[in-house]
Amino acid sequence: MNPVNDIIDSYSAIVYTHKTVGVDKLASHYLGWNEIKELSKYYDGEMAVLQTCNRIEIYLFSRNESSVNEILHYLNEVHNKVISTDATILRGEEAIKHLFEVASGIDSLSVGEYEILKQIKDAMRDSIKLGIGSRYIRALLERSLKVGRRVRLETGISRGKVGVYSLAVEFAKSRFGDILGKKIAILGAGEIGGKLALILHNEGATDVTIFNRTFERGRNLAIKYGYSYFPLDFSRLHNYDIIFSAIFYPEKVKAPEGTVVIDLGSPPVFEGSNVYTLKDLEELSKATLEERQREIERAESIIREGLEEFRKDCLNLVYDNFVSSFMSRVEETRKEEVERALKVLGDDGEETREVLEAMTRSMIKKIFSPMFQNLRRAVENNEINYINLATSLLTHGGISQDKTKEIKTEQEYKGRSSGDETDS
């Protein structure tokens, strides 16, 4: 028995990305907030959903082997079509390694992008908010963030212009040679629109207009960078050189002629021969990938070390689970014995109770603290055999708390019966 392997093997991932299903098809696989909320009720286990413009990934922790199939069944139902066959299923260390690669920016449309770290944080926040992200999913996501930060600190993978939004601006520059003096429109004032506005500002672009459905949000973003702003109105877009679109719209819109439209939506809103989408940015990303290959190799080495660190995280989880479970039993027994002592003494006064409470707590601390210190050292030194022995001996040989109570009650009953027979 290896408790760490047991934890590792309980992780899995359901993965859809621009690489595995394509950008166009990916657009029809996204989950809305209400659908994720419903999924959290449907699934009995820990889970986090990571969704970006180029991936939809569901990370699971469950000792139930059928959990992945349950999720896939739900995905088919909620999309009213079979999408389970498009999924890549990763299990155990393979799922963990994949998340570390994603967090490191080496499995991305734009190698080395920073945005993914925030997106993983958001996935963890949402998971906790929905009550489906407890200690195991949190441990996985937190370690992935540490690996991602270390990769960026110790390699040059994120040096220079990285990220889908930077790629979009670079793509526009490749079409015109320069964007200074060009008339530019940004559709959308959300996270993507905000990133584009910042990048364009840093590039020195000044003739930029923000279009947004919510007028106030568009105005606030425009004021921040000294840009113009209007409510979203497709009829106003004919005089622009470049349009960056970062919106969802239920209908397709014909792109204005003579304008370069870079549509980062999934699915894209605009159509026409002058429209460029995430699919087109992939080609630019491939060139970047070749340039960063040496940094990717260094990142992979850090990821391998991250996997070893995560095994230590799992050992700490074993320790915490053991201490929590064991001490809850000890505390229950302590309380029972205090009550029994008070009955024997025939004194339920506050002072007597306080003395017994303090004495029993002190005894427990003095008896078990050295043992837990040794167990902690065993965890730090990865001494699996010692940990297995301790957890087996000190958790009633693996018998559940309910079963322990049942045995205890039976023994007490037998003891009373035996006493009655002697008296007669």
UniProtKB/Swiss-Prot annotation:
Gene3D superfamilies: Glutamyl-tRNA reductase, N-terminal domain (3.30.460.30), NAD(P)-binding Rossmann-like Domain (3.40.50.720). GO terms for molecular function: glutamyl-tRNA reductase activity; NADP binding. It catalyses: (S)-4-amino-5-oxopentanoate + tRNA(Glu) + NADP(+) = L-glutamyl-tRNA(Glu) + NADPH + H(+). The active site is at C53. InterPro entries: 4pyrrol_synth_GluRdtase (IPR000343), 4pyrrol_synth_GluRdtase_dimer (IPR015896), 4pyrrol_synth_GluRdtase_N (IPR015895), GluRdtase_CS (IPR018214), GluRdtase_dimer_dom_sf (IPR036453), GluRdtase_N_sf (IPR036343), NAD(P)-bd_dom_sf (IPR036291), Shikm_DH/Glu-tRNA_Rdtase (IPR006151). Residues 401-424 are annotated as: Disordered. Residues 402-424 have a biased composition (Basic and acidic residues). Substrate binds at T52, C53, N54, R55, S108, E113, Y114, E115, Q119. Its EC number is 1.2.1.70. The record marks H98 as: Important for activity. The keyword Nucleotide-binding does not apply. NADP(+) binds at G188, A189, G190, E191, I192, G193. GO terms for biological process: protoporphyrinogen IX biosynthetic process from glutamate. It is an enzyme of class 1 (oxidoreductase). Keywords: NADP, Oxidoreductase, Porphyrin biosynthesis. Possesses an unusual extended V-shaped dimeric structure with each monomer consisting of three distinct domains arranged along a curved 'spinal' alpha-helix. The N-terminal catalytic domain specifically recognizes the glutamate moiety of the substrate. The second domain is the NADPH-binding domain, and the third C-terminal domain is responsible for dimerization. PANTHER family: GLUTAMYL-TRNA REDUCTASE. Belongs to the glutamyl-tRNA reductase family. Catalyzes the NADPH-dependent reduction of glutamyl-tRNA(Glu) to glutamate 1-semialdehyde (GSA). During catalysis, the active site Cys acts as a nucleophile attacking the alpha-carbonyl group of tRNA-bound glutamate with the formation of a thioester intermediate between enzyme and glutamate, and the concomitant release of tRNA(Glu). The thioester intermediate is finally reduced by direct hydride transfer from NADPH, to form the product GSA. This is Glutamyl-tRNA reductase. It comes from Metallosphaera sedula (strain ATCC 51363 / DSM 5348 / JCM 9185 / NBRC 15509 / TH2). The lineage of its organism: Archaea, Thermoproteota, Thermoprotei, Sulfolobales, Sulfolobaceae. The gene is hemA.
